[in-house]
Amino acid sequence: MASFKPTKVLSYPKLGEKVTEETLYWKNYKPPVQIKEFGAVSKIDFSPLPPHNYAVTASTRVHIYGLHSQEPIRNFTRFHDTAYGGSFRGDGKLLVAGSEEGLIRLFDIGGRVSLRQFKGHSKAVHATSFLSDGFRVLSGSDDLTCRVWDVASAVELSSITEHTDYIRAIAPSKLNPDVFVTGSYDHTVKMFDVRSGNSVMTMQHGQPVECVLLYPSEALLVSTGGRYVKVWDLLKGGQQLVSLKNHHKTVTCACLSSSNKLLTASLDRHVKVYNSSYKVVHNFDCASSILSLAVAPDDEAVAVGMTNGVLSIRHRKHKEEKEALTGRRKRGPSYRFFVKGKNFVPRQDDFLVSKPVRQHLQKYDKQLKRFEVSKALDTALETWTRTTKPEVTVAVIMELNRRGTLKNALAGRDEVSLTKILNFLLKHITDPRFSRPLLTVGDIVLDLYQQVIPQSPVVERLLQRLYEILGREAELQQELLQVLGILDTLFASLMPRKEVASFGAAAAAQESQLQAA
């Protein structure tokens, strides 16, 4: 009796992802270094001047870390409650931070005691920053106000009350020291001019705004809130340029790289890098939800702060380190490996015993061996198989069709199993690799269940979608055939024409050859 032949599953080449220079650039980072903080890391800010230390705001402290250090080189612990929004001044010598108690503190990087305290907010101050002149501080608070303070005298210069909900994001202009942008939980993004005290532009984000960001040219503005990242064209009066929805949860922060590429981070634990056309070119995965994100100048490091109090820093690999890693060689085999069996000499009376190779069959092959065709199809349509290895499901269908039992396997299905088959058809019937056997399945399903389709609205809806997909595919095939006909005509017109001698001329030439002979 011949042995059972397992189902032959065709192997298809895997299409790798398109690797671009930007993808390689952002993959060129070491594994992250993780530092445990005292609470959720709400803000990270790099100093604009070398050695590019960065401030980390977490719990009731603001720590200053060196670019390659894992221990803080400076601690600011004068906060009685949670600290927020620690930010450097343009020269990297001063730092400002808000707090849950409503106070804003100004620190000298070289000292520990606060130089100034700005009092005036009645609720928590989540966003603080220096205006570009360096002599004024901007703050946004949960008391619905945005205020400007004088650094020298600690006096409030102006207060703006146009927002109707918490102000959680601010972005001062670097080109004009009197202009800044705010984002609020009232779903609006506003641009203000300190000289007038009123907003000069308003954009509707549509979700509570968590972060606002100005491009260096200040022609574009980025706002994040909810699952959306929106880019606004300020030169066109705040017109929306693009709306991105690549995250699954709230986008909490955004920043720009040295080449002005946009990076966004979300509660879904992903950092996404966009190119100039706002397509995702790389992802960084983190262990917990992300609250803060910052990129060092020249992209030397990417720092991420998370809700579980972990600060994660990825440093860029340098050429010397790459050469050191690639230059290592694996240890070669030992001497005993080479001399093993060297002195063995087979004898003439040796008897060679071949060990039989046991054949291991898959579950669907065992069922096919027992002629359980319906169970074999059910096994091939299991969730993991049909989603990760559709070629296995199609191979079982082709084997059933070869045996002539495909119709029997598809018959007698309930609504749940029929829904699985139809969903598989919807997903893969337009795939050129699987279209021929799946079209056969579709014909058999229509023949078997045509009378009972109206009884199930789910099956009827899936069949309607299948009908629409096949209609679009037929239209596409028709258009491709038309294009093929046009190309054939063009190629035929471009081909050089060959002159064909007439019958009379050929006969005269033959007669002249005979006379000459």
UniProtKB/Swiss-Prot annotation:
Kindly state the subunit structure of this protein: Part of the small subunit (SSU) processome, composed of more than 70 proteins and the RNA chaperone small nucleolar RNA (snoRNA) U3. May be a component of the proposed t-UTP subcomplex of the ribosomal small subunit (SSU) processome.
One biological process term from GO is: rRNA processing
UniProt keyword annotation of Nucleus present: yes
Q: Which residues form the signal peptide?
A: none
* InterPro entries reported in the protein's UniProt record: U3_snoRNA-assocProt_15_C (IPR018983), WD40/YVTN_repeat-like_dom_sf (IPR015943), WD40_repeat_CS (IPR019775), WD40_repeat_dom_sf (IPR036322), WD40_rpt (IPR001680)
WD repeat residue intervals: 36-75, 78-117, 120-159, 162-202, 204-242, 246-285, 287-324
* Keyword Nucleus attached: yes
Which keywords does UniProt give here? Answer: Nucleus, Repeat, rRNA processing, WD repeat
Q: What does this protein do?
A: Ribosome biogenesis factor. Involved in nucleolar processing of pre-18S ribosomal RNA. Required for optimal pre-ribosomal RNA transcription by RNA polymerase I. Part of the small subunit (SSU) processome, first precursor of the small eukaryotic ribosomal subunit. During the assembly of the SSU processome in the nucleolus, many ribosome biogenesis factors, an RNA chaperone and ribosomal proteins associate with the nascent pre-rRNA and work in concert to generate RNA folding, modifications, rearrangements and cleavage as well as targeted degradation of pre-ribosomal RNA by the RNA exosome.
**One GO location term (cellular component):** nucleolus
Cited Pfam families: UTP15_C, WD40
Return the protein name: U3 small nucleolar RNA-associated protein 15 homolog
Subcellular localization, as worded in the UniProt entry: Nucleus, Nucleolus
Gene name in the database record: utp15
Where is this protein primarily located?
nucleus
